[in-house]
Amino acid sequence: EGEHPRRSWLVKNRRLVHFLMLFSGGFSLYIFFDFSVITQLVIILLGILCFLYPFTLRRIPFIKIVVIALVWSTTTMLLFTLENNIIISVNEILHLVARFFFVFAITIPFDIKDLEYDTKNIITIPLFFGIRRSKLIASFLLFISIFIAVFQYNTSSLILAHLLALILLYFIALVFVWKSDEKKKEMYFAFWGEGLSICAYLFLVISLLIF
């Protein structure tokens, strides 16, 4: 097995990586003390989870993708809710679940790409279920997210512009999932996979301008 291209890049650019880690860590610590206590506690718990992953948690099958989806969805939605003292209602829970499923789904293609590297180290969904079934799992989660968005719209918890932006995002995510395979170049995953988060914001802005 060859060395993972992302690992090779990190090794070659380790000084830059270390500098960015120190800078972002220092800045994060600076703003950490401006948050409320409950927000700080959640951040600490997420930090402990991320810290334990490479030492003990990674031995648990499928835990990597769960940790990624949990940390991403929590930091981009739940922390904002807690910090602004927004009451966590059914609507907020549904939104968090939909975001968790979305992140979970778009992370599966990265595990497909890493199949040859993860074989000896970690049990992932594509390794256990195969590529096609993994894509079906991702599709199922994305369709659940669409269902949640439609449900929220029907209960007046979501405006039309938000609904259309989310549906477009989820369908593009579906295309990304089904076009993914282990032979795709690294740039495909870096551009489309990582870029979906930016697309979510762009779709929302465009949808609000139109509707």
PLM regions: where:
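Solvent-exposed interhelical
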Residues: E1-L22, F100-F143
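Membrane-interface helix-boundary motifs at transmembrane edges
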Residues: G2-L10, F33-S36, L57-I60, I86-V90, ...
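Intramembrane alpha-helical segments
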Residues: W9-E83, F176-K179
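Helix-coil boundary and interhelical linker segments in multi-pass alpha-helical membrane proteins
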Residues: F27-L41, T76-V97, I148-A161, V205-F211
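Hydrophobic core segments of alpha-helical transmembrane domains in multi-pass membrane proteins
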Residues: T39-C50, L94-F101, H162-Y170
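Functional transmembrane core segments of multi-pass inner-membrane proteins
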Residues: I65-E116, L136
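Glycine/small-residue-rich hydrophobic helix-like segments
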Residues: I125-L174
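Extended hydrophobic alpha-helices typical of membrane-associated regions
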Residues: L163-F211
